[in-house]
């Protein structure tokens, strides 16, 4: 009888272990399916992100092209004006000067239309954000004494710094010794 009880206990234990193993197998299968689903979702998100990145790169290139085209379309009239000026190159020096001045003024209007403005020049305070000091000249200290090359900016973005000489107080020979 004791042996039978022992067998019954073993059978119950074995049955319990079998049920537990089956439950663990079901949980493992569910976890594997969940992992597969998450992996698929991850791969789709990765592909979506890669497609998004490519679209953004293409859009950026397209906008850059549009900007260049806009600038070129705005500048082509200057080329037309230069061609017309060359046709009249035989004219008097004064008429050539007037023509070049008109072309220059038109070019500045185009730059203004593109949002470009000239960096402040002579007599203005030297600003290292917009000016490149290339020398010193007698003049008011800290002020731009002479502009060698104009600078331009578009909003706060610097297109090209102005190359300038900055004023400094004139020193006496005795001060140098």
UniProtKB/Swiss-Prot annotation:
Subcellular location field: Cytoplasm
InterPro entries in UniProt: GrpE (IPR000740), GrpE_coiled_coil (IPR013805), GrpE_head (IPR009012)
Cofactor(s) needed by this chain: K(+)
GO MF term list: adenyl-nucleotide exchange factor activity; protein homodimerization activity; protein-folding chaperone binding; unfolded protein binding
Pfam family, one: GrpE
Annotated keywords: Chaperone, Cytoplasm, Stress response
Primary location class: cytoplasm
SUPFAM superfamilies referenced in this protein's UniProt entry, alphabetically: Coiled-coil domain of nucleotide exchange factor GrpE, Head domain of nucleotide exchange factor GrpE
Cofactor note: Required to stimulate the ATPase activity of DnaK.
Keyword Secreted: no
GO terms of biological process kind: protein folding
Superkingdom, natural source: Bacteria
One GO cellular component, as annotated: cytoplasm
Family, per entry: Belongs to the GrpE family.
Subunit structure: Homodimer.
Role summary: Participates actively in the response to hyperosmotic and heat shock by preventing the aggregation of stress-denatured proteins, in association with DnaK and GrpE. It is the nucleotide exchange factor for DnaK and may function as a thermosensor. Unfolded proteins bind initially to DnaJ; upon interaction with the DnaJ-bound protein, DnaK hydrolyzes its bound ATP, resulting in the formation of a stable complex. GrpE releases ADP from DnaK; ATP binding to DnaK triggers the release of the substrate protein, thus completing the reaction cycle.
Protein name (Swiss-Prot/TrEMBL): Protein GrpE
Organism of this sequence: Thermus thermophilus (strain ATCC 27634 / DSM 579 / HB8)
Gene name, Swiss-Prot/TrEMBL: grpE
């Amino acid at each position: 009888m004791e042996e039978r009880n022992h067998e019954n206990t073993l059978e119950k234990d074995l049955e319990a272990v079998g049920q537990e193993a089956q439950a663990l197998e079901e949980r493992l299968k569910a976890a594997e399916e969940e992992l597969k689903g998450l992996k698929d979702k991850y791969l789709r998100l990765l592909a979506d992100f890669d497609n998004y990145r490519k679209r953004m790169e293409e859009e950026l290139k397209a906008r850059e092209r549009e900007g260049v085209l806009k600038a070129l379309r705005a500048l082509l009239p200057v080329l037309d004006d230069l061609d017309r000026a060359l046709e009249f190159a035989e004219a008097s020096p004064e008429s050539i000067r007037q023509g070049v001045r008109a072309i220059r003024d038109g070019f500045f209007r185009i730059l203004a239309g593109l949002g470009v403005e000239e960096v402040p020049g002579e007599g203005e305070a030297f600003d290292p954000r917009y000016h490149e000091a290339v020398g010193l000249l007698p003049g008011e200290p800290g002020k731009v004494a002479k502009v060698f090359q104009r600078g331009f900016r578009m909003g706060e973005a610097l297109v090209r710094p102005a190359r300038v000489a900055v004023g400094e107080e004139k020193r006496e020979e005795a001060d140098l010794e």
